[in-house]
Amino acid sequence: QANASTIANNFVSANVDLILANATTALQACAAATTDIPILGTSVTDYATALEISDWSGTTGRNISGTSDLAPLDQQEDMLVELYPDAKHVAILYCSAEANSKYQATEFEKYLDEDGISYKEFTASDSNDIGSVVQSATEYADVIYIPTDNTMLKSVIRNSATEHRSNQQYRTSGRNSDYCRRGRYL
């Protein structure tokens, strides 16, 4: 966050015409740095959550616009059910410091509820906690769902969660292309 704030403040000091903020942290830093310079966001899942807008109307009502990277959660849940029809317990694994991840988890849970699938959230506050959280999740779940979550993505790819479930089938569900390249994607 500190680096993003420094960069955003440098843009404001340079009086740039437009700021392109890539990801939630950058968007939040830019939003805090200026209310005048137009900001375009990208790789932001939910603007209302990222900007703490409680009465969301579909626009921010300020100098910020952009695109969302949210893939339809109902379709993700449908795919999970189709690929793993025997799944009874889904672990939802995310970093509690990422507001957009919490948003996705909460929304995804609604679809699991509709299909009568039990779930439990497993959160890590930072990358130091992920190993033990993944271990707990693999002990609970038939399938692990990981929303778009940069902290979790980096750690799960770096330290394969499959190490925690040796000699057992391990299934993950997520929507990031890096999961796919490493064989951890639906």
Please report, for each region that a protein language model flagged, where it lies by residue.
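Short hydrophobic alpha-helices and adjacent helix-cap/hinge residues
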Residues: Q1-L186
